[in-house]
Amino acid sequence: MRPEGSLTYRVPERLRQGFCGVGRAAQALVCASAKEGTAFRMEAVQEGAAGVESEQAALGEEAVLLLDDIMAEVEVVAEEEGLVERREEAQRAQQAVPGPGPMTPESALEELLAVQVELEPVNAQARKAFSRQREKMERRRKPHLDRRGAVIQSVPGFWANVIANHPQMSALITDEDEDMLSYMVSLEVEEEKHPVHLCKIMLFFRSNPYFQNKVITKEYLVNITEYRASHSTPIEWYPDYEVEAYRRRHHNSSLNFFNWFSDHNFAGSNKIAEILCKDLWRNPLQYYKRMKPPEEGTETSGDSQLLS
């Protein structure tokens, strides 16, 4: 018999299977650990131990993610059942009261207020569910982004090529900008949603004749309509180039990559930030190679020619 005031929730079949999956993952993890321990003591092969430890870590991470999913779904099921019970109670209460006559503006506003009060916890539940889902997806994306970054390190000039080939960015880059970008080794973008939506752009450089910084960080506050400059790393120009940097910044007042790079608050610089955050970072490979225009008098084949 269930004590008065307690709640019991049904666990869907997919969740019971999920719990079994976590149990099997944990059991496999223990068995793998025991077997590897025996092999290590008998053969003293350090490399084998490292490989199994890596597999165990991956398996453990999958188990944690699965458990997070299960607990999140259980919480959602509980909240949904509680909401259904409250709605049914409200309907029974309304049926017990004689039907109302035409509503006056005052009574309509009172009813509207009551509906809005009921809607608030539903909105809060939706925000919580969305936040959990976003955090879960970010955890799943991270190992892929880390692997992508490691692979890009093996492609010389990858990011300089990507930026120069972008149809909007290419119009903002001069020959001097391209030479400066040739020293760029990596690009990273991080987004934070709480307490404010913030986009952080990090450009990594090897030693070059222009500036001393190894990392240039630019931060933007993001809202529905724009990217607004928030913070930027001051550029430490070398003395031999400082005068030239000043000349370039004041000689050309139009929007270009150098003015965005050297002056965080330059008018229109939010356009470049939006391109980097929303387009280049998400799929840079599509801009690494560009289409080669067909020569006159030749027919285009099914296989497109590409320029690196």
Swiss-Prot record:
It is found in: Cytoplasm; Nucleus. GO terms for biological process: cell differentiation; gonadal mesoderm development; nucleosome assembly; spermatogenesis. One of its GO terms (molecular function) is histone binding. GO terms for cellular component: chromatin; cytoplasm; nucleus. Its main location: cytoplasm. InterPro entries: NAP-like_sf, NAP_family. Keywords: Cytoplasm, Developmental protein, Differentiation, Gonadal differentiation, Nucleus, Spermatogenesis. Pfam families: NAP (PF00956). It comes from the Eukaryota. May be involved in sperm differentiation and proliferation. Belongs to the nucleosome assembly protein (NAP) family. This is Testis-specific Y-encoded protein 3. It comes from Homo sapiens (Human). The lineage of its organism: Eukaryota, Metazoa, Chordata, Craniata, Vertebrata.
